[in-house]
Amino acid sequence: MFESVYNLPEQIQKAYEIGKNISVNVKAEDIDKVVITGLGGSAIGGNLLRVFVLDKCKIPVIVNRDYVLPAYVDSKTLVIASSYSGNTEETLSAYQDAKAKGAKIIAITTGGKLKEFAEKDGFDVITIPSGLQPRAALGYSFIPLLMLFVKLGLIEPVDDQIEETVKVLSDLRERYKPEVPEEKNLAKRLTLKLWNKLPIIYGISGTTEVIAERWKGQICENSKSPAYFNVFSELNHNEIVGTESPKHILGLFEIVMLHDTEDHKRNAIRMDITKDLIKGVVSGVNDIYSIGNSRLARMFSLIYLGDYVSLYLATLYQNDPTPVKKIDILKNKLAEIKD
């Protein structure tokens, strides 16, 4: 897993090359909404895309994480079925639902039943390289979708942003890699603060919300320890009140607040006020800021730090970050149960 994380800049570059060669039959004038259906690591790519194009794409982009699709899916809907393995049962079910509803479908996968079904049914397939854990293939599950939106004319070209992202991540890995000592390594310093604590990751709606979710997922899957996330300003309308009792539990909370230059000004203010309200109640509050000029580079700079933190936590807990045994057991048990 360390190798996969280290190689993310190269993965993004390869994913960009895949994206440049995408050719699909779908036309922008034939669709009025996009639904990206997937789970886990595959869904994160779609959710990142949703946030990235939020103020750029003129049609709705929705992420679906279920066996079925919403009732509004119809012949004017582009359904992107994303499953790294190609065998995710919820995604396969949603694919069949999309087909039944007459939607336009594009699959993004390494193979499996999803590729088999899509090719048999005459739908476009974006094939990405196999051999990784889905969560380690974020570049492959996100960048081709981004390039697809460019090809369809739904957003402006992003070539310069991808180039900067590769450069920023290449620089950051030289700061975060295992050989760099703690005093010069932000990833290691933050990991030590989260170790033997309960990490709570806070993002901001429209900018870092999905990145906070990614941090949570990476900590859970890689370090095999619990983590949670929430989003401003919603958490100011409920969760903030739950910081009075029980004090012995709250004292284990280590908060990470993710900041970006495009955060809504009022949400940035909310973050500062919230920090003052919970200091002294929780174990600590850590402010983490994005790096880079373009939106894409800044997003991935935060993602990359979270990836490294999750791996260093796994090391401290003496857990192998790669296997996800409980997910495998769950899938096997589900496979034994027929409807």
UniProtKB/Swiss-Prot annotation:
D-fructose 6-phosphate binds at residues 41-42, 83, 85, 88, 135, 237, 331. CDD domains: SIS_PGI_PMI_1, SIS_PGI_PMI_2. Its EC number is 5.3.1.8, 5.3.1.9. InterPro entries: Glu6P/Mann6P_isomerase_C, SIS_dom, SIS_dom_sf, SIS_PGI/PMI_1. Signal peptide: none annotated. Homodimer. This is Bifunctional phosphoglucose/phosphomannose isomerase. It comes from Caldicellulosiruptor bescii (strain ATCC BAA-1888 / DSM 6725 / KCTC 15123 / Z-1320) (Anaerocellum thermophilum).
